[in-house]
């Protein structure tokens, strides 16, 4: 399942904006094995629209009928740093993001990953799902 959420302050109907930008967001594989150390996320942007992004990427496990963050193995060294932003001079056709999973307990189940981008005051939230067997 891939979802794209596009938010622009003060604008309720963003269907026209979604038509103007075509972004594909996909996990490298649909199914991973237990204790996979990393996953790669690819975002293709076949437009010349520059997108800003930070280090943030959210990872969730489907548990008890809701999406929950997975349990971390050791939280004593965890540093959260996602307030920075990057903008590349020319819009690349393909972005690749690597997400380390070896810090988490990754049991079998259904997962989703989210990555946010922005363009001025507009925010794009991309989501994709995968499975661990």
Annotate the PLM regions.
Residues 1-79, 116-133:
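Primarily secretory-pathway and cell-envelope proteins
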Residues 73-110, 116-120:
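Short, solvent-exposed, Trp/other aromatic-anchored flexible loops in extracytoplasmic proteins
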């Amino acid at each position: 399942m891939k979802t794209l959420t596009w938010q622009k302050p003060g604008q309720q109907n963003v269907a026209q904006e979604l038509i103007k930008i075509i972004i594909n967001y996909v996990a490298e594989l649909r199914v991973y094995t237990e204790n996979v150390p990393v996953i790669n996320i690819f975002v293709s942007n076949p437009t010349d629209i520059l997108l800003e992004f930070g280090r943030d990427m959210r990872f969730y496990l489907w548990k008890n009928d809701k999406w929950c963050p997975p349990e971390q193995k050791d939280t004593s060294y965890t540093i959260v740093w996602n307030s920075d932003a990057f903008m590349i001079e020319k819009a690349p056709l393909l972005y690749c993001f690597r997400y380390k999973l070896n810090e988490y307990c990754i049991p079998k189940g259904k997962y989703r990953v989210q990555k946010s981008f922005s363009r001025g005051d507009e925010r794009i939230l991309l989501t994709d799902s995968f499975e661990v067997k």
